[in-house]
């Protein structure tokens, strides 16, 4: 970001003094209104909720409220900057929830990197919320935190860095395959990056029918038996790279139909793209500098190029997913956001790009396409009902 843009961002945040605020819904302008909204009238809904805790969704705002939870350990590209320093991002996330899907959200920035403490904190607060969005928590802690919270909370828990990224990337993949005449079951996908996002994208792709997946970390292709794998990567090796391809990213990407980058600038070269299948699909999502620039990928033979940036076509932007996903989950009071719901969200996003308009520069809707959140919410709510996690 240019220095003048950085200063402008600072100036605006100083002017705003926060991007969200609490606004009252009940009129309190007379003694009578005060008596209804607070004492003594407030006792009646309290007693109802005491009789049936689920009535907290009826008599309070809980059913539209999401906790945006971070420990500040993996904030954007800034790293472990701490919970307070992560607050501007969490406020921004809350603002996006409200703007795109009318979901109320509140930041919870926790002063701990301990899994037990984070899980216990969120578990104890879960009764105040209708859902939990985990944000900017480093891998591999985020996997354990998400898994355990799903076990102990009766409200949906969603890690956007994993699951939101996976949904949007898979939506783009659906249309890129349609554009290039490919079937998901027939493609070879190679990943650069074995963190939370990469593994989650690969997992959703596998669920959607992709069979040939290779994930590369800094040491090259991951496969069963490779030295230096942590427990998360050991598990990943059981369902990826069944042919045990070894070697660097350059070796793994040969003949691949799709490259997915969630790693570092410059990780993919034009020479690597030239070794891929004809009309390859390149998703270079490192920010702010992608693994390869779109024009370079296209010049090397790619048919479709997408990035995480708004100044290029085909932006892989999580705002296409998380507002609508939570809107749909909250609308049916879902107890979980499961794989069925995420797959439904991906197909809903992809479906907004029809055959007539689909092109190399348009395989995913834009961030401000007002059709997206309602379409995603409807698909997610339907999938929640069909998979048995809806409570309405």
Region spans (language model):
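Solvent-exposed alpha-helices and their adjacent loops that cap or buttress functional pockets
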Residues: 14, 57-62, 98-99, 124-126, ...
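General beta-strand structural signal in soluble alpha/beta enzymes
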Residues: 107, 133-136, 157-160, 191, ...
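Short, ordered loop/turn segments at secondary-structure junctions
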Residues: 71-73, 81, 110-111, 136-139, ...
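Glycine-rich phosphate/diphosphate-binding loop of Rossmann-like nucleotide-binding domains
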Residues: 76, 81-101, 159, 163, ...
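Adenosine-phosphate binding glycine-rich loop
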Residues: 160-161, 284-392
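N-terminal ligand-binding/catalytic initiation module
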Residues: 1-157, 377, 383, 387, ...
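Rossmann-like adenosine-cofactor binding region
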Residues: 234-303, 309-311
């Amino acid at each position: 970001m240019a220095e003048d843009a950085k200063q402008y961002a600072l100036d605006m945040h100083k002017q705003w003094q926060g991007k969200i605020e609490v606004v009252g819904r009940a009129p309190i302008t007379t003694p009578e209104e005060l008596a209804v909204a607070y004492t003594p009238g407030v006792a009646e809904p309290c007693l109802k909720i005491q009789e049936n805790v689920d009535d907290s969704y009826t008599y309070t705002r809980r059913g539209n409220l999401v906790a945006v939870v971070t420990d500040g350990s993996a904030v954007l590209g800034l790293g472990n900057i701490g919970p307070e320093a992560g607050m501007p991002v969490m406020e921004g996330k809350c603002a996006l929830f409200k703007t795109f899907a009318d979901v109320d959200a509140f930041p919870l920035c926790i002063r701990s990197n301990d899994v037990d403490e984070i899980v216990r904190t969120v578990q104890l607060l879960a009764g105040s919320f209708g859902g939990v969005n985990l944000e900017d928590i480093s891998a591999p802690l985020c996997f354990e935190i998400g898994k355990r919270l799903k076990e102990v909370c009766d409200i949906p828990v969603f890690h956007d860095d994993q699951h939101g990224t996976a949904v949007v990337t898979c939506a783009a993949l659906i249309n890129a395959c349609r554009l290039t005449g490919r079937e998901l079951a027939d493609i070879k996908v190679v990943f650069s990056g074995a963190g939370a996002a990469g593994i989650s994208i690969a997992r959703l792709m596998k669920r959607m029918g992709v069979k040939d997946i290779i994930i590369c970390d800094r040491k090259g292709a991951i496969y069963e038996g490779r030295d230096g794998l942590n427990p998360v990567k050991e598990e990943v090796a059981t369902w990826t790279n069944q042919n045990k391809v070894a070697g660097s990213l350059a070796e793994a990407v040969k003949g691949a139909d799709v490259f997915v980058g969630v790693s570092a600038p410059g990780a993919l070269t034009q020479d690597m793209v030239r070794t891929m299948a004809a009309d390859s699909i390149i998703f270079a999502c490192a920010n702010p500098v992608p693994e390869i620039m779109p024009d370079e990928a296209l010049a090397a033979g790619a048919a479709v190029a997408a990035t995480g940036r708004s100044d290029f076509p085909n932006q892989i932007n999580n705002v296409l997913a998380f507002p609508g996903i939570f809107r749909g989950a909250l609308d049916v009071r879902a107890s979980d956001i499961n794989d069925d719901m995420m797959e439904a969200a991906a197909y809903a996003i992809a479906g907004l790009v029809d055959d007539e308009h689909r092109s190399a520069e348009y395989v995913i809707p834009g961030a401000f396409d007002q059709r997206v959140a309602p379409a995603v919410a409807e698909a997610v709510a339907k999938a929640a009902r069909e998979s048995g996690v809806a409570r309405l």
